[in-house]
């Protein structure tokens, strides 16, 4: 990533790229953040024919060998996503892997799936111990690693989520 890129610019690149990608696929796209600075729940909404989608865009930096980490901060109640309703099938996360100022990969995933996997990964992580045998400290940090690494549940998500990789058609189902 070029020097000077910060998490805000990586996030903005992802958001703009999703807007452009959807517009090119004949979706009408609106940005909640254009009216509400850094909207708390959704970033974008998209409409195509009779289909509507509420989108939470999450960008992450891609490093050497496409290493990338999807990171969230859980709320005090343990939830990652505000206003997540299991009955709402219109709620999606679009993950954007950014390298050198451009999105190189997208994952289009129902928000409930991302929430479930982040919680499960965090639970499994805390069942293990640190190298010195002591318990791992419980924090609000949640992470999934895209790259393969050892045999940890929280690694290898590019492979595990392959069916969501650049699969924009999921928004139309």
Model-derived features: positions:
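Mixed-charge (Asp/Glu-Lys/Arg
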Residues: 1-40, 45-173
């Amino acid at each position: 990533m070029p020097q000077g890129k910060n998490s805000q610019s990586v996030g903005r690149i992802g958001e703009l790229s999703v807007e452009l990608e959807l517009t090119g696929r004949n979706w009408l796209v609106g940005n909640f953040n254009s009216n509400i600075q850094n909207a708390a729940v959704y970033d974008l909404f998209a409409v195509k024919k009779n289909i509507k989608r509420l989108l939470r865009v999450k960008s992450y930096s891609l490093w050497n060998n496409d290493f990338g980490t999807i990171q969230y901060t859980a709320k005090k109640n343990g939830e990652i996503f505000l206003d997540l309703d299991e009955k709402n099938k219109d709620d999606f996360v679009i993950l954007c892997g950014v390298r050198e100022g451009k999105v190189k990969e997208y994952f289009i995933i129902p928000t409930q799936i991302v929430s479930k996997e982040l919680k499960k990964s965090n639970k499994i992580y805390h069942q293990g111990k640190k190298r010195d045998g002591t318990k791992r400290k419980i924090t609000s940090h949640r992470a999934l690693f895209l790259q393969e690494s050892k045999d940890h549940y929280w690694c290898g998500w590019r492979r595990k989520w392959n069916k969501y990789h650049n699969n924009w058609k999921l928004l139309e189902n």
